[in-house]
Amino acid sequence: MTKCKIILVISLSILALLCIGCIENSTINTKTTVNSTVDTKTIINTDSVEEYDIATANNAFTFDLYSMVKNEDENVLFSPYSIFSAMAVCYDGTEGSTKEQMSNAFYYPLNKLVLEESSKKMIGTINSNNDAYDLETTNALWVLENYTLNEQYVSNAKNYYDGMVTPVDFVNEPEASTDTINKWVEEKTNEKIKKLIPEGEIGPDTRLVITNTIYFNGTWVKEFDPDITRTRSFTLSNGDEKSVSTMRIVEKFNYGEDQKAKILELPYKGDNLSMYIVLPKENNITELENNFTLKYYSKLKENMSTGDYVEVWIPKFTFKTEAELKSPLIEMGVVDAFNPNAANFSGITPDKSLAISEIYHQAFVDVHEKGTEAAAATGAIILEEEIEYTWEFKADHPFLFMIEDKRTGCILFIGKVESPEYEKMS
């Protein structure tokens, strides 16, 4: 018996993609693991938009997923917001146990209207204009020509998620359909993600592709002077050393520490976004990762001090990552959505034979003296050699980083730098 499938492709910082087509029956592992310190029941059972904290929900999911995808001796990068947002569009069409499992894993409220209103507000905040940086999130739905979607689902996608519907011919022109979507992705990501959907992925069985993008390009409030960037030693988790291009600055930054780790805030121009770097005091990133929860991260931030000069050393880094998220999400309890015999996406279409077959994730980050991604800025730079500093933040071994929207408290990106490399991106 043939069933229909949902393939979810998510590009970190850039795209989340949902395909609905057909899949053969398969067996799904039902192990469930959740590693959050958040009260799930309180979050998902609220019926009030005012009481539902979508940023806390997103951030709780962030740490749950990180605990599943962290990899020893490898760089890590993903956009929890992109995944959270794309799956919210998907969640809007779920019912029954499929809905309940996704609610538990993503901290979505069971009352869909609460999530819809909260998401609309979040999207509006993220997309508000600011000349100091580029930050935009977008949604789009690409549907098979003449395929029936529920009118209410289409209306919700447009009104709450700003998701416009475009008909495409997956059956007769799968390659052209792939090119159309990939070119849209390339445009929305400033050409940083190209050919996201692989050749042959879209075919006659594809019914719907849902894309969610979040793109960020910002410059530091306090830029690093490229003239004092030097090649310095960086010690990997296994003890090996490598030479990396390392930036240095002495400036006033928000800084904190406890017995295990140091935390530093590097704000971006525009005052709305910051990168937070968490550096273990010893070269033991695995131990930090194993105990890195939303509660611990929040406590580190709460104990940060202001007004002191900090000597900062961090490597330049740029890398791309790819991951398949089906397995970790199943471990987090999203089981039925992947099972063609159990999935219930009846809110999307009258066709009841839909299921997710796989979730793909791509990621890109570029951190250098000017900021994150590619950006140009001018400004006077103080010669930090002449300044006395109180604290030292020397990232010469693996560390974690988060890019956060301070208006909402929402973590947009999270990653680990295990082995920094830098290649100037065009």
Swiss-Prot record:
Task: Say if the entry is tagged with keyword Translocase.
Answer: no
SMART domains linked to this entry? SERPIN
Q: Does the record carry Repressor as a key word?
A: no
Q: Which Gene Ontology CC terms are recorded?
A: extracellular space
Q: Which UniProt keywords apply?
A: Protease inhibitor, Serine protease inhibitor
Site annotation (Reactive bond) points to: E384, E385
Q: Please provide, alphabetically and separated by semicolons, the GO molecular function terms listed in this UniProt record.
A: serine-type endopeptidase inhibitor activity
InterPro entries in the cross-refs: Serpin_CS, Serpin_dom, Serpin_fam, Serpin_sf, Serpin_sf_1, Serpin_sf_2
> Where on the tree of life does the source sit, at the highest rank?
Archaea
| Similarity comment: family membership | Belongs to the serpin family.
Q: What is this protein called?
A: Uncharacterized serpin-like protein MA_2246
Please report the organism this UniProt entry assigns to the protein. Answer: Methanosarcina acetivorans (strain ATCC 35395 / DSM 2834 / JCM 12185 / C2A)
